Amino acid sequence: MRVVRFGAEGIATRHQGIPGLIMQTPSQSPQPADSSYAWWRLVASLALSTIGGVGLWSAVVILPTIEAEFGVGRGGASLPYTAAMIGFAIGGVLMGKLADRAGIILPLMISGPLLGLGFVLAALTTSYWQFVIVQAVFVGMLGSSVTFGPLVADVSLWFRRWRGIAVAIVASGNYLAGAIWPSILERTIAVVGWRESYMGIGVFCVVTMVPLGLLLRRRAVVDGTGPSKAPSASGPLPLSPTHVQGVLVVAAIACCVAMSMPQVHIIAYCGDLGYGPAIGAQMLSLMLAMGVISRLGSGLIADHIGGLPTLILGSALQCLSLVFYLPFNGLTSLYVVSAIFGLAQGGIVPNYALVVREYFPAREAGTRVSLVLMSSVVGMAIGGWMSGAIYDLTGSYEAAFLNGIAWNLLNIAIVSWLLATRLRARESLAQ
C-alpha cells in the first residue's frame, strides 16, 4: 500500500530558487505561480464559470413549467435537472482527462458551442423525453461540465500561496450563475415563454464563451512528482490513493444529496406555500449570493488551516441550517433561513478540490479534482430527484428535509474520520 504524503510541488523558478510552478508555452516566457497573469486568467475563468453555470440552474427555474408543459409529477419534473447533473458529472470527468492531456483550451472550445446548441435544441423539443435527453447530453455532459471541475483544476495549477482563495473564486462562478440566472430566466419566461428564453441563452453562450475560452490558451507546466503542501499538512495519511479518492467521492455525494433539497426545490416549495415561483427564484438567488460570500471566506480560511478542517466546519453548519427549515415556513423566516443556508454550505464543494490537491500530484489534478467535484454533482442529481420523489409519496417536503439531514450527518462522519485518521498518523510519527 502506498502511503499518501504531503510534499513540495512543482519546479523551482531559476531566478529565485523558490519551489513553485512555471507556466509557459513554446512561444512565451515562463510565468511563476501567483503571478499577475494568473490573476487575470482567474478573472476569465470566473466569467466562463458564471456563464456556463446557466446549464445547472435553468432546469431548476422551469421545474414548475415542465410539470405543466408535459403533464408530469414533481418527481418527473425534477428528472431533467437530474439528467443534466448526471451528464454534467460524466462530462466533467471526461473533460478533466482531456484537459490533463491537451490543456483546458480544447474542452472549452467544445463546451461553448455545444452548450449553446443544447439550449436551442431543448427549445425545439416536442416531448418530455426529448427534453430530458438534450439536458443530459448537450447541456450537461458536453456543455456546462467543462466550466466546473476541469476549470477549477486548471486554476489550481496557476496558484500556490493563494490556491485556496483562487479555487474558491472560480468555484463561485457556479453560485454567481445561480444568483444571476434564475431571476433573469423567471422574468424572460414570464414575458416571452421558456422556449424563446432558452434560444436566447443558447446564442449568448456561444458568443461569449468562445472568445473567453481563447484567453486561456496558455498551459501550465507542472512537475507531477508529488502532492501540494497544505497549510495544515504535517504528516502522512496511512491510506492508499485509491482509498482516499473513494472516501472523498462518497463524502461528496452525501453532502450534496443534502445540499440539493433547498437548492433544487425552493422555487417549487414557495409555490406550494402560496408565495409563488417568483419569490422562490428570489430566495434561490439570495441563497446562492450568500454562497459566493461563503466560498470566498472558506477559501481564505482553508489557506490558513487546510482543506479538511474547513470542510468539516462547512458541513456542520450546513446540517444546522437544514434543521432550521423544519420549523420555519413564513415568508420572512424563509428568506432568513435561505440566507443562513447559503452562508453555511457555499464553501463546502471547493474544499474537496483543495483536499485533492493536498493529497495528489499536480499532473493528476484535472482527472482527480473533476472526479470528486463531479461526485458532488451526482449527489445533487440524486438528491434533487429523491426530494421530488419523497414529495410525491408524502405530499410535503418535511420528510425530504429530514432525508437531507441524514445524508449530511453521513458526510460529517466520513470527513471527521478522515481527519482523525490523519491526526493519529501524525501522532504515531511523533512518537
Regions inferred by a protein language model and the residue ranges of each:
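Helix-loop-helix hairpin linking two adjacent transmembrane segments in secondary transporters
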Residues: 169-220
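Conserved MFS/SLC helix-loop-helix module at the cytosolic interface between two early adjacent transmembrane helices
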Residues: 90-129, 302
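Extracytoplasmic
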Residues: 40-74, 95, 181-182, 261-267
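Hydrophobic core of transmembrane alpha-helices in multi-pass small-molecule transporters
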Residues: 50, 118, 130-146, 253, ...
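Interfacial helix-cap and linker-helix signal at transmembrane-aqueous boundaries
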Residues: 66-67, 98-99, 180-192, 270-271, ...
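Cytoplasmic helix-loop-helix junction between adjacent transmembrane helices
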Residues: 135-172
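Structural signature of the two symmetry-related core transmembrane helices
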Residues: 106-120, 309-324
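Extracytoplasmic gate region of multi-pass secondary transporters
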Residues: 59-63, 243-299
